[in-house]
């Protein structure tokens, strides 16, 4: 016998679906507007969502090609967008790998080992993580200015220095991975130890394979944070060719000239690495956000 839903329930479903549609539209509208701006002629921030005439000049400039106009003028690419994109991907990728490695080993120590001051260290790490990075900009500049005199590849105006600065933000990831490790039964490692495995082998061959979902989550969050970060990168990087895309895109918007079309094309390009990482790690990301680990 078919079940008939009461009118009140149908009304709630209708309102829920309308609310979801409005929410999706609110999310998609800025993205569609940025794409529309990148396809318009000229550098204007206002206009219709669907351009009257599609122009690829902003995309050609963003990809490093010159644009020849009808009157014979040639506009060269104003900035090395693809170089900035490569710098961003390189810094974000190395940073994410380093954060996963450091966070995993630290989390293992906090989850499985006993040592004096463990609780104090955990709380201290979390408290320091609550302070915004902008409060440490002066100290970071002084630190890397001095470090560059002894270790040039992690000084000012180096990608190594930016990566080294980003590696300091692992406290929250340590807490996240530690919580996941604690949901995995320690008897699995004890069984491996009985079979002759060393603590390192038990960690590498037993615990890490079971923790791939949470490691994927940490990698993605670290990658996104590094590729979109501006204050620290803009402080440490000076040369235009060493900029990340997030820092370099500010060059399009100066008081003398606002290149909104070029800015929009570069903004869309900046979303490609994050989208690819999400697509490649989607399966592990869902498991890491929903699974609780292996019990028993």
Curated annotation (Swiss-Prot):
Span of domain ABC transmembrane type-1: 85-281
Mode of membrane association: Multi-pass membrane protein
Claim: Heme is one of the keywords in the record: no
Periplasmic topology ranges: 36-88, 144-152, 228-257
Keywords from the UniProt entry: Cell inner membrane, Cell membrane, Membrane, Sugar transport, Transmembrane, Transmembrane helix, Transport
Subcellular location: Cell inner membrane
Residues passing through the membrane, by range: 13-35, 89-111, 124-143, 153-175, 205-227, 258-280
GO molecular function list: ABC-type maltose transporter activity
Cytoplasmic-facing ranges: 1-12, 112-123, 176-204, 281-296
GO cellular component: plasma membrane
Gene3D superfamilies linked: MetI-like (1.10.3720.10)
Entry keyword annotation includes RNA-binding: no
GO biological process per UniProt: maltodextrin transmembrane transport; maltose transport
Pfam families registered for this protein in UniProt: BPD_transp_1
PROSITE patterns associated with the record: ABC_TM1
Function: Part of the ABC transporter complex MalEFGK involved in maltose/maltodextrin import. Probably responsible for the translocation of the substrate across the membrane.
PANTHER family: MALTOSE TRANSPORT SYSTEM PERMEASE-RELATED, MALTOSE_MALTODEXTRIN TRANSPORT SYSTEM PERMEASE PROTEIN MALG
Record family assignment: Belongs to the binding-protein-dependent transport system permease family. MalFG subfamily.
Record note on quaternary structure: The complex is composed of two ATP-binding proteins (MalK), two transmembrane proteins (MalG and MalF) and a solute-binding protein (MalE).
NCBIfam families: PRK10998.1
Protein name as annotated: Maltose/maltodextrin transport system permease protein MalG
Organism phylogeny: Bacteria, Pseudomonadati, Pseudomonadota, Gammaproteobacteria, Enterobacterales
Gene from which this protein is expressed: malG
